[in-house]
Structure formats: C-alpha cells, structure tokens
Design a protein with these regions (language model features):
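Bacterial N-terminal signal peptides
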Residues: 15-24
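Bacterial N-terminal signal peptides that target proteins for export
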Residues: 5-14
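Beta-rich carbohydrate-recognition modules and glycan-binding surfaces
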Residues: 7, 24-204
Length: 204
C-alpha cells in the first residue's frame, strides 16, 4: 500500500491544478468579454426614450405610391418597423431612418445589428449627409421568420446608390461622415412586412 500522506498530497495537488485551470479560463473569458464591449459602441438603443423623436418614415408616397409603414417603440426596449408594400402606381418601397446626427465613427470598421425578421429581404442604409434625398449606402440582408439574428457589416460592403441605382462614380463610404442610419424594404415584395430591431452598434 502507498503512503497515505503522499496519496493525500497528490489529491490536493490535483485539485489545485484543476482550480487554477478553471480560474484561468474564467479570467480569459472576462477579458475577452470586456474587450468585445470596449470594441463596440451603441449607436441606437431603443431602450432610450429619446429615440422616439429621432426616427422618421419615408415611403413611396413621395413618388405617388401607396405603400404604408410605421415604427413602433415596444415596452421591451425594441422597435418594430412594419407595414404593407403595394406595387400600385409604380410604387413598392417603405423605409425608416434616424434623423441627422454626427456619429463620428472614424476608426470603426462596420455596423452590428440585432434584428428579428419575417423571412423577407431588407436593406440596412446609411447616409453621410442630412439631405432628404441623395446618395445613400446600402447593405442587403435576408431574414428568417421569427428568428433573432446578429448581422455584422463591414463598411467596405456598403454600396452607394441613388434612388435604387448603384452609383459607380461615388467614393466609398466614410465612417467619420455617417449621419443617418435606417432600414428599407423594396424589390417588389408586395404585402405585409415586419422587422424588430433590438439595437445598432458600431464595431472596431
């Protein structure tokens, strides 16, 4: 039989080693989490009641269409953009966007959005000026019905467009100049639509 003292010592040593490994993993997880938090910045938080005054609706009625939409601020701290797309009178789009604000995103690499959709395709849009019309930068994404998604979009993947047409002679987006953020549905997707947005962040 072995020495009982040595056996006990080995058991204690084993416990100490396992404990140190566990603490190392926990500490690294905390560091990683903290790094992720500092690498992202919240741009739009619908828990903030001030956001209710910062969003506007722009539909195809500006060109004679009859599509309808609204943005609803939920008690859960999210916002719902919903409505109905009509193709009558050559219409077919609805959108919502934030009012002009200088976000000062120099040094950031892209946008991170948490969203729940309805299975239709949407566009995340940003603008670098405060004009009602003009150049915007879009990123197309598909949604899954009643499924929350995290969408990370590098600024390099935003495409400059004017009234739905890609502009090849426009400079790439300048993060430092971004002033408006929003969502748009088009592409002849007639009928009801609905997306729910939790937040919009910028990431490095």
């Amino acid at each position: 039989m072995g020495d009982p003292f040595m056996k006990k010592a080995r058991q204690v040593l084993f416990v100490i080693v396992i404990l140190n490994i566990y603490l190392s993993i926990v500490s690294w997880s905390d560091i990683t989490s903290a790094t992720m938090e500092t690498a992202e910045r919240i741009l739009i938080d619908f828990n903030n009641t001030d956001e209710k005054e910062n969003w506007q609706i722009i539909n195809d009625d500006v060109m004679g269409g009859v599509s309808q939409s609204e943005i609803i601020f939920n008690d859960t701290g999210t916002a719902t953009f919903q409505g109905r797309i009509s193709l009558e009178n050559n219409g077919g789009f609805a959108s919502t966007r934030s009012k002009s604000h200088s976000y000062r995103l120099g040094g950031y690499n892209g946008l991170h959005v948490r969203i729940q959709g309805d299975g239709k395709d949407y566009q995340l849009r940003v603008r670098t000026d405060n004009r009602f019309d003009g150049i915007s930068y879009r990123y197309r994404f598909a949604t899954q019905p009643e499924t929350w998604m995290n969408i990370r979009v590098p600024f390099s993947e935003f495409v400059p467009v004017f009234r739905g047409r890609i502009q090849s002679n426009v400079s790439p987006i300048s993060p430092e100049q971004i002033q408006q953020v929003g969502f748009l549905i088009s592409d002849k997707q007639a009928g009801k639509f609905r997306i729910e947005i939790d937040w919009i962040k910028a990431y490095k």
